[in-house]
Amino acid sequence: PGPLCERVEEKSGGTCVYLSGSIGGLMTPDSRAENFYEVTRIGASVADLALKGLENPTASEKKAALGWRFEIIRIPVENSRYLLFLPALKFGHKIYDSAGRPVSGWKIFRLSLKHALRRLSAAERPWVESEVSLIDIGPARLLGIPGEIFPELVIGGYDGRFRAGHPLINPENPNPPDLKRAPKGPYLKDLLARPLKLVVGLANDEVGYLVPEYDFKVQPTLSMTP
C-alpha cells in the first residue's frame, strides 16, 4: 500500500485511499530476496493500472448518492488456541455465551482455564461479535468483509477461467482440494446489484482467513484443532 499510494499521489496530486480486497489466498510472488524491491515494483504497477483506469472511466458522478448499512454477526470460537488465549479477544470485541448473553471479564478467564484443563464443550464455547457492512456510492457498491476472504468465494473460478495459464491446483500440493466439493454460484460479487462492485477485506475487523469449506483440512494431531 505504501508505494502504491505514494505513486498515485505523486502522479495525480490528490489523496490516495487504499482498501484491501480479497487477500485471503496468499497469492504473492515467490521472492527470496530480503528487501522491499517486490513491494515497490508491485505497488507502482498497480498504481499505474489504477491511474490508467481513470483515463476512461466506465462511470462517474459529480453528486453521488451515499448509503450505508451494517449487520452485526456472532461467530463461535472453536479454535483451541483462541480459547486458551480468550482474554486477548475481548479487546475490540464483545464476547457472548451460546445463549447470546454477554460474558464478563472474569468469566472469560475462567473459560480459558476450563478449556486448558478439560476442553470446552460446544455449548460452553463463547461467541465473538463482528460486523458485515455495505456502502453505496452512486453506481458503486462496497461489501465490507471482517477478515481475509479467499478470492474464489468472491468471484468463483473453480472451472479454471481465471488461472491465466497456470495449473488450477499445484501438482506438488500434498493436500490438494477436492474441486468436486467447491461451492456453486452465485458468488459474492454476483449478489452485489450495482454496475461497480467491490469487496473490501479487513473491514472494521480481522476474524482471520475466510476459507472455502471444501479447501479446509485440519490434521487431528494439530494443537489448533477445535
Predicted feature locations:
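Non-catalytic substrate/cofactor recognition surfaces at enzyme active-site rims
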Residues: 1-226
